[in-house]
Design a protein with these regions (language model features):
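Aromatic-lined, polymer-binding surfaces characteristic
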Residues: 88-151, 185-187
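Extended glycan-interaction surfaces of carbohydrate-active proteins
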Residues: 21-61, 73, 91, 97-109, ...
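Well-ordered alpha-helical scaffold segments within catalytic/enzyme domains
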Residues: 1-2, 69-85, 129-146, 190-201, ...
Length: 314
């Protein structure tokens, strides 16, 4: 529980430092905000395929999913009685400015979860996380018996939900798509199941899982999206997307298929069990940042999702 306490405190410190509720999408471990990106003049990069970048330009971006991610991370502290923390009304009120930001920005263009540098759209995954911010604030308020606040946040969540359903579903693609009114597919919409936006058996969610698997799946691996980005058409699988797919398949009742993909995906780890950010389809070679937190969290979440209850083995 100590790790959870420290994590919650780090989140709340980030919230306390925010100006007007705005939080940049990436911070240093010590909450540093200036993460100026530069290219190393001496490092050649993996197999000479530079450039090697130091810092992260994303600190300048506007990514509206940030607010939902922080509130999702903080919400369990209000309900988990193992954590001896003061997570009452004061902490809730500290989170509300983030909810206000999510509400104001839920249908505004941003750089999206993938930190795209060259275009801004109303990304479905960003709107989804804005919905999650309002939804969880409503649940926290109800838990704290703050009836007026609970009603307000629940109403806002419902408004955002309706906009996503109206604008992100594509009849032509038979799936939820990357952005409002768009037509391209993006693996991040699979998070709809994980955050509880739609019931797993909703036909639209099932159709989305199947369509994304068909178009973006490459064996056990998965592309982030099908459209060219700042660096061209994606050529390798982004590992956390493959774990999102596994989670979604398990949720819609295809556990054995999910388990098979999970076991195949684990073969991409190194001899220490660590996993990179990306994997080359043909060779299984790790690319990108290493080790990658997203990938390692994907392993943990996937194992928990697919674990059989011990009673089933008796």
């Amino acid at each position: 529980t100590r790790t959870l306490e420290h994590y919650f405190q780090w989140l709340m410190n980030a919230v306390a430092d925010a100006e007007g509720g705005h939080i940049q999408p990436v911070l240093g471990l010590g909450l540093e905000t200036a993460l100026t990106e530069r290219i190393s003049p001496t490092l050649q990069g993996f197999r000479g395929m530079g450039p090697v970048r130091i810092g992260n330009q994303a600190h300048e971006h506007f990514q509206h999913d940030t607010y939902g991610n922080i509130i999702l991370g903080a919400a369990p502290a209000f309900f988990d009685h193992r954590l001896p923390m003061n997570t009452g009304r004061t902490a809730f009120e500290q989170l509300e400015p983030l909810g206000e930001q999510a509400w104001e920005l839920h249908d505004e263009p941003d750089a999206g979860i993938w930190e795209l540098r060259s275009r801004a759209r109303i990304h479905t995954s960003s709107s989804l996380m804005c919905w999650a911010a309002c939804d969880r604030l409503g649940k926290i308020a109800r838990h704290l018996k703050l009836d007026d606040r609970a009603a307000l946040w629940a109403e806002r969540a419902e408004v955002i939900r309706d906009k996503i359903l109206d604008n992100a579903w594509s009849e032509d693609r038979g799936a939820f798509v990357e952005s409002f009114g768009g037509s391209t597919l993006d693996a991040s919409v699979l998070l709809m199941g994980e955050v509880g936006f739609l019931p797993p058996k909703d036909p639209r969610f099932i159709a989305t899982v199947e369509r994304l698997s068909e178009v973006l799946g490459r064996g056990p691996f998965m592309l982030r999206y099908e459209e060219a980005d700042d660096f061209g058409v994606p050529e390798v699988g982004f590992n956390v997307c493959a774990f999102w797919r596994i989670d979604a398949l398990a949720r819609i009742g295809r556990e054995e298929e999910a388990r098979k993909l999970f076991e195949e995906l684990l073969e991409a780890r190194n001899h220490l069990g660590l996993m990179s950010e990306d994997t080359a389809f043909a060779t299984g070679e790790g690319w990108g940042n290493f080790p990658q937190t997203y990938s390692m969290v994907g392993i943990i979440n996937g194992a928990m999702r697919l674990s059989r209850r011990w009673e089933a083995e008796l």
